[in-house]
Amino acid sequence: MSQIHSQIHSQANTSQTLATNLLILGAGPAGYTAAIYAARANLSPVLVTGLQPGGQLTITTEVENYPGFATAIQGPWLMEQMAQQAVHTGTRIEYDLITSVDFSHGSPFHLMGDSGTTYKARSVIIATGAQARWLGLPNEKRLQGAGVSACATCDGFFYRGKNVVVVGGGNTAVEEALYLTHHAAHVTVIHRRDKFRAEKVLQERLFNEKKISVRWNTIVEDILSAGAPPVVTGVVLRYFTKNTQHTIATDGVFIAIGHTPTTSLFQGQLELDSEGYIVIPTPRSTQTSVPGIFAAGDVQDKIYRQAVTAAGTGCMASLDAERFLSGL
């Protein structure tokens, strides 16, 4: 058991009410940063971890773009350090999952945990993140961090001079492919349709890039690997028009079919956009459509989606919550 897990409060099979100045939902960079700042402001925050403490960084083997580390660090280790710092500064961490919320009556807000605990919070920071959409292939999860990725900005550096595949046809896929040309020797875009959904200007850039080729009307049926530990060696493709299979060699597979924000719990409670992301009505703020409810990290960010930007908005949300609680 890790050191931080021994300090987490488990509320399994309990029925109690826990009151707090600030309740933070989510245990990724945004949530932990918010907790650290809130604890230092003597707000005595409570952080509810949700199902995946540590967020997406728990499945990221090497992190090279988080400031302060000259060499690559492990994603799970980084999250453990953030959690320890949050606890050290005075955060109470609850290993629980929020299953229902009621923001309709204003502060204090009432939230129910899967454990049976009722949380009563004067303010709330939502940092529940967003999950990359995956293809659902048998080897996909097993090879994450070993050649399979959903973030070119995070992992493109590891494919200098190598061949990679990008799966998808929207803005995300085209942007990922263009970014990867700065590192990879060649990028093959796999798209199940005969045209992209991406913006025209992005398509023009892609078609003018000599290091990119496109395979239309094609899906990935399997991801191949070899070695111990295994690494990606190729993909099995199926062409719709000919109903034939073909295998191509590749060093990396980038899945770029979008992200799903973890916001279903807040439908009807907060303003969400057409993709389910929490709307921040006021620029340069983290305030949601309900006063006293703030959002940080990927749950409100469909553009950057980086650990460092998530941490930054976590800091902002904590400062905004502090001002709200002070009546400023």
What are these regions (language model features)?
Residues 5, 9-10, 17, 131, ...:
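FAD-site-proximal beta/loop scaffold in flavoenzymes
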Residues 86-113, 118-121, 182-282, 323-327:
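A Rossmann-like FAD-binding core segment of flavoenzymes
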Residues 19-21, 160-162, 217, 290:
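Phosphate-coordination loops involved in phosphoryl transfer and adenosine-cofactor binding
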Residues 174-176, 290, 296-328:
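A conserved FAD-binding loop/helix module that cradles the flavin
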Residues 93-115, 119-157:
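Glycine/small-residue-rich loop that forms an oxyanion/phosphate-binding "nest" at active or ligand-binding sites
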Residues 28-29, 52, 130-132, 171-172, ...:
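Residue-level detector of alpha-helix initiation sites
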Residues 7, 16, 20-89, 174-200, ...:
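Beta1-alpha1 glycine-rich phosphate/pyrophosphate-binding loop at the start
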